């Protein structure tokens, strides 16, 4: 019989996405939408529906910067992913 070993990372807890997102509020993030558009800005707020508010936001279309915005509200159902920049 073969034995299966479970690896555990010492000192780290298994946390969900809501914990991660609450920890990065105020940080610079990249938000990619399903249509390929990306926004780079400071995460101000996020709710349970993944609705996002960014500040000092830059919009990138096809990898090129398209526009600069102050505040941006992004509806959660458009979000593909959020990453810390």
Swiss-Prot record:
It comes from the Eukaryota. Residues 16-85 form the Sm domain. Coiled coil: none annotated. GO terms for biological process: maturation of SSU-rRNA; mRNA splicing, via spliceosome; tRNA processing. GO terms for molecular function: RNA binding. It is found in: Cytoplasm; Nucleus. GO terms for cellular component: nucleolus; P-body; sno(s)RNA-containing ribonucleoprotein complex; spliceosomal complex; U4/U6 x U5 tri-snRNP complex; U6 snRNP. InterPro entries: Lsm6/sSmF, LSM_dom_sf, Sm, Sm_dom_euk/arc. Keywords: Cytoplasm, mRNA processing, mRNA splicing, Nucleus, Ribonucleoprotein, RNA-binding, rRNA processing, Spliceosome, tRNA processing. Pfam families: LSM. Component of the heptameric LSM1-LSM7 complex, which consists of LSM1, LSM2, LSM3, LSM4, LSM5, LSM6 and LSM7. Component of the heptameric LSM2-LSM8 complex, which consists of LSM2, LSM3, LSM4, LSM5, LSM6, LSM7 and LSM8. The LSm subunits form a seven-membered ring structure with a doughnut shape. Belongs to the snRNP Sm proteins family. SmF/LSm6 subfamily. Component of LSm protein complexes, which are involved in RNA processing and may function in a chaperone-like manner, facilitating the efficient association of RNA processing factors with their substrates. Component of the cytoplasmic LSM1-LSM7 complex, which is thought to be involved in mRNA degradation by activating the decapping step in the 5'-to-3' mRNA decay pathway. Component of the nuclear LSM2-LSM8 complex, which is involved in splicing of nuclear mRNAs. This is U6 snRNA-associated Sm-like protein LSm6.
